[in-house]
Amino acid sequence: SASRERGAGFEEAIAKHEGINVVAKQPANFDRTQGLDVATNLLQAHPDVKAIFAENDEMALGALEALGDRAGTEVIVVGFDGTTEGLSAVEDGRMLATIAQQPEELGARAVEEAAKLLRGEDAEAEVPVEVVTVSSDNVADYQ
């Protein structure tokens, strides 16, 4: 699933960097309110946390609520999906980045594969589409 792949990608990237200590991992079921609750508990248990990675923007936005004024200054937050609210949070500096999917490319590739099937050709079982890190440097390109 996308959730497992996002989590595995996070683990793989973290393993490449010494000195990063992951203090907690907890699901929030891709829900903003649960993201708020999880982040609140995390901050109570680990008040010196420096960063929060959420597997979607909804959970990241919940973490931003829990952080209040600390968001983007004392604690960096990264979300995933490139949603409208996630992009706004990046633009105003509360969120460091969101990992944006490319829905136009996903749709185009899906149509290409469906057309192959309609012609009786073999279609790819999986068609990877690159994601894009959206930060303050390029957020204007995605709004």
List the model feature ranges, each with a label.
Residues 2, 12-16, 102-143:
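Hinge/cleft segment of the Venus flytrap/periplasmic-binding protein
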Residues 13-17, 41-45, 66-70, 89, ...:
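Structured segments of extracytoplasmic/periplasmic soluble domains
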Residues 81-96, 140-143:
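Flexible loop/hinge segments that line or gate small-molecule binding clefts
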Residues 6-7, 60, 87, 107-111:
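A general structural signal for well-ordered alpha-helical segments in protein cores
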Residues 19-22:
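A generic structural motif
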Residues 10, 24, 28-88:
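Hydrophobic alpha-helical
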